[in-house]
Amino acid sequence: MASRYLTLAAALLASFLQVDIEANSWWSLAMNPVQIPEAYIVGAQPLCSQLAGLSPGQKKLCQLYQDHMQYIGEGAKTGIKECQYQFRHRRWNCSTVDNISVFGRVMQIGSRETAFTYSISAAGVVNAVSRACRAGELSTCGCSRARRPKDLQRDWLWGGCGDNLDYGYRFAKEFVDAREREKIHQKGSYESSRTLMNLHNNEAGRRTVYNLADVACKCHGVSGSCSLKTCWLQLADFRKVGDFLKEKYDSAASMKLNSRGKLVQVNSRFNPPTTNDLVYVDPSPDYCVRNESTGSMGTQGRLCNKTSEGMDGCELMCCGRGYDQFKTVQTERCHCKFHWCCYVKCKKCTEIVDQFVCK
């Protein structure tokens, strides 16, 4: 146990040395939606210089692809929302802070929570840019040009306007990874391990979106006979991406640097992680109590479930500190009836319910 905390302390010390490097993030585009004034369409420099959180390489990409920036922000926002959904019942609930770091100091620790955040954010950008291509919102891409799947029935048409996953993947890789690739760290340093970790998890997020995409089809024919189908490539619902990466979070691999400056698994008895797995280099901090040095917001004041034995239960969520009970009034729709034709009319019902919050 003592060695675990010594490892965490060393990681924290190392991470604080790179505060300036990690303090700004492109994730901030999610918090401040990008608006592109008409006057900036020709001259990109004013717009890109005003966007907080971009690295030098990302600013150059912004100048070349400024119409993409809105969708990078949308992708980051999608990733953050999905992160908060997946961790809504955990001590760390992917909460954001009111500055351009978005998540605060907690991202300076190379924990499995950081691994998930990087992966889901990168996935969000692939998702948003791929859809924007299909919708004709971007000047450099259009509908998907993916090859016809070999197992598609011969009499089905391959066409339509699919999500441009190939373009979304390539652009997300170029933009999101730019910050990591332009860093120069001493071989074998903690910072170099974080860079390798971030790049690996970014790729895992992108691959998840790519691998979960599937063929969608529309029927054609007399009276809905479906004698002919037109098919195209379609992204999976982003909830599936979040569910998949959450499973990878639960089984994430603990890594360390070897003498050659490569990440290797701490426990060599396990199979090495694949490009679809998440990796981390630091143990998670204590999320039970508020700690400004680690970025933990603690669980005081969090709602908990008195009857649950899971992570959302009061015993685990409150870390044994106990909980307070209070009553609240909830209003919801009730006694709904369908009226011909065609609407549903409901009444509003109120009830007093017990809620529990951690001390």
Swiss-Prot record:
Query: InterPro entries per the record?
Result: Wnt (IPR005817), Wnt_C (IPR043158), Wnt_CS (IPR018161)
- State the disulfide connectivity: 83-94, 133-141, 143-161, 217-231, 219-226, 288-319, 304-314, 318-358, 334-349, 336-346, 341-342
Recorded GO molecular functions are: cytokine activity; frizzled binding
Q: Which locations, inside or outside the cell, does it occupy?
A: Secreted, Extracellular space, Extracellular matrix; Secreted
The signal peptide, as residue positions, is 1-20
What are its GO cellular component terms?
extracellular space
Question: What CDD domains does this protein's entry cite?
Answer: Wnt_Wnt5a
Q: Keyword Translocase on this protein?
A: no
List all annotated glycosylation positions: 93, 99, 291, 305
Instruction: Spell out the coiled coil positions from the record.
Output: none
User: Domain of life here?
Assistant: Eukaryota
Lipid attachment locations (O-palmitoleoyl serine): 223
Record keywords, A-Z: Developmental protein, Disulfide bond, Extracellular matrix, Glycoprotein, Lipoprotein, Secreted, Signal, Wnt signaling pathway
Q: Name one GO biological process term.
A: canonical Wnt signaling pathway
Q: How is it modified after translation?
A: Palmitoleoylation is required for efficient binding to frizzled receptors. Depalmitoleoylation leads to Wnt signaling pathway inhibition.
Q: Which family does it belong to?
A: Belongs to the Wnt family.
As for what it does, the entry says: Ligand for members of the frizzled family of seven transmembrane receptors. Can activate or inhibit canonical Wnt signaling, depending on receptor context. Required during embryogenesis for extension of the primary anterior-posterior axis.
Protein name per UniProt: Protein Wnt-5a
Species of origin: Pleurodeles waltl (Iberian ribbed newt)
